[in-house]
Amino acid sequence: MDATGSAEHFTRMGTLGIEEEFYVVDEFGRPTSGTDELVYETEPPAVLDGRLDHELFKCVIETQTPRIDDPANAGDHLRSVRDALVDHAEANGFGIAAAGLHPLAKWRELEHAEKPRYKSQLDRIQYPQHRNTTAGLHVHVGVDDADKAVWVANELRWHLPLMLALSANSPYWNGFDTGLQSARGKIFEALPNTGMPTTFDDYDAFETYEQRMLETGSIDDRGELWFDVRPHSGHGTVEVRAPDGQADPDRVLAFVEYVHELVVDLAERYEDGESGRRLRREFLDENKWRAIRHGQSAELLSRDLSTTRSVEELVEIESDRLGVDGLWELYHRESGAERQRRLRSEEGVMALADSLRLS
């Protein structure tokens, strides 16, 4: 990875890219070291060539779709990559599972990757990174101007708590019930340069920040700016990183549809000369906390801060405004966190683990 990107990379509007982090699991559905075998020691299917990588723990693996020029093809690309990963894992004696945190993952019992980048992070960050067994969904949308991308990222912050509430799929961490709907949201926020970013006036301001962080040794590369949304100066995209990982591809595609339509809508508003909203980070953090704690039952602060709105109200507003159906489908289905708790209570931990496996 190049240390920094460039404004010149922002050349395409509306393209898509989907990154997913998964757990490598054994025959019992428990996270296990497997990325060395799957990424380095065996040859993956052609569709995964250059699109497969390991993460901090040897039990976490990441896939990336190719650039998707037509959003209508997102489902085919996503399923093709997922199917190839499952086949590759099974051919080597592993399974693949997805959630924001795996309920059976105990970080002290799991191996960290040996890649120099991760060794540097572990040494620099220490405990918060040592325990970071999280897995998320990252959606990239191409933006054709760097200043526009920064403006869009600023505006997207308001919508992130709704995404997190609908995606909440990590009630368990280190083997116990946290009482949260998305414990991943809190575990990951313990790292530096995470959570809700502040606003940037333009791309120059963002680039200056990125450069200062590198020059001062705060980060080793731009990829270590792990905010919930960021202009990706390498890909020329706006990257949304808020949602928990999901086993069901239909849930993933609902978020992809929503993020894409949001970015396109905001880009048009920028082009129309709309002024951005100066939202206090404290209120954004409050809404994120409510999403972490309550998931789909959350009451989120309204834009004018005069009242709260239920997730159901916000889903109705966003679905009607953007013409997206997937949000309603997400809302009316049992949430990932609710399903995990129900399965553990009714059928036990092995049924819970099995429910997270991709097939």
Curated annotation (Swiss-Prot):
Q: Which UniProt keywords apply?
A: ATP-binding, Ligase, Nucleotide-binding
Task: Please tell me whether the keyword Ion transport is annotated for this protein.
Answer: no
What are the GO MF terms of this UniProt record?
Answer: ATP binding; glutamate-cysteine ligase activity
Signal peptide positions are none
- Biological process (GO), any one: modified amino acid biosynthetic process
Q: Name one Pfam family in it.
A: GCS2
InterPro entries in the record: GCL_type2/YbdK_subfam (IPR050141), GCS2 (IPR006336), Gln_synth/guanido_kin_cat_dom (IPR014746), YbdK (IPR011793)
HAMAP family assigned to the protein according to its UniProt record, in alphabetical order: Glu_cys_ligase_2
Summarizing the function annotation, the protein's role is: Catalyzes the synthesis of gamma-glutamylcysteine (gamma-GC), the main low-molecular-weight thiol compound instead of glutathione in halophilic archaea.
What family is this protein classified in? Answer: Belongs to the glutamate--cysteine ligase type 2 family. YbdK subfamily.
Instruction: Please report the name of this protein according to its UniProt entry.
Output: Glutamate--cysteine ligase
Q: What is the protein's species of origin?
A: Haloarcula marismortui (strain ATCC 43049 / DSM 3752 / JCM 8966 / VKM B-1809) (Halobacterium marismortui)
Q: What is the lineage of its organism?
A: Archaea, Methanobacteriati, Methanobacteriota, Stenosarchaea group, Halobacteria
